[in-house]
């Protein structure tokens, strides 16, 4: 199975939705985090993880420092379970 990001439309769709949620209501970042925890469980080449579970990943997004929305963080090639 090809797990490259270019074929990972489900993850892209979830990420875009969460970005839109963040942009529309930046004061509700925790809601976006909750949505992402439920929608972005991925099977990574190294381990299973939820996108926002790892503290370093939350810090990588730097919500408060990026007014136009969350930055994309480069992670291992993964695919939606």
UniProtKB/Swiss-Prot annotation:
* Name of the protein: Protein L83L
Family recorded in the similarity comment: Belongs to the asfivirus L83L family.
Q: Using the UniProt annotation, give all residue ranges assigned to the region (Disordered).
A: 1-28
Function according to Swiss-Prot or TrEMBL: May subvert the host innate immune response by interacting with host IL1B and interfering with its function.
Inducing or repressing factors? Expressed in the early phase of the viral replicative cycle.
Instruction: Keywords in alphabetical order, please.
Output: Early protein, Host cytoplasm, Host-virus interaction
Q: Where is the composition biased (Basic and acidic residues)?
A: 14-28
Q: Where are the transmembrane segments?
A: none
| Complex formation | Interacts with host IL1B.
Any single GO CC term annotated in Swiss-Prot or TrEMBL for this entry: host cell cytoplasm
Protein location = Host cytoplasm
UniProt keyword Membrane present: no
Please state the protein's primary subcellular location. host cell
């Amino acid at each position: 199975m090809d797990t490259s990001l270019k074929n990972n439309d489900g993850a892209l769709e979830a990420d875009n939705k969460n970005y839109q949620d963040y942009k529309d209501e930046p004061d509700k970042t925790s809601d976006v985090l909750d949505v992402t925890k439920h929608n972005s469980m991925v099977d990574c080449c190294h381990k299973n993880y939820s996108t926002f579970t790892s503290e370093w990943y939350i810090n990588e997004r730097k919500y408060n420092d990026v007014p136009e929305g969350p930055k994309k963080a480069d992670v291992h090639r993964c695919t939606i379970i």
